[in-house]
């Protein structure tokens, strides 16, 4: 749910 937005997976 928005992991790239939260910069946890990107």
From Swiss-Prot:
Keyword line: Disulfide bond, Secreted, Toxin
CC terms in the record's Gene Ontology section: extracellular region
Subcellular location as annotated: Secreted
Tissue distribution of the protein: Expressed by the venom duct.
Principal subcellular localization: secreted
Post-translational modification: Contains 2 disulfide bonds that can be either 'C1-C3, C2-C4' or 'C1-C4, C2-C3', since these disulfide connectivities have been observed for conotoxins with cysteine framework V (for examples, see AC P0DQQ7 and AC P81755).
GO molecular function, one term: toxin activity
Family: Belongs to the conotoxin T superfamily.
Comment text on domains: The cysteine framework is V (CC-CC).
Protein name as it appears in the record: Conotoxin ar5d
Upper taxonomic lineage: Eukaryota, Metazoa, Spiralia, Lophotrochozoa, Mollusca
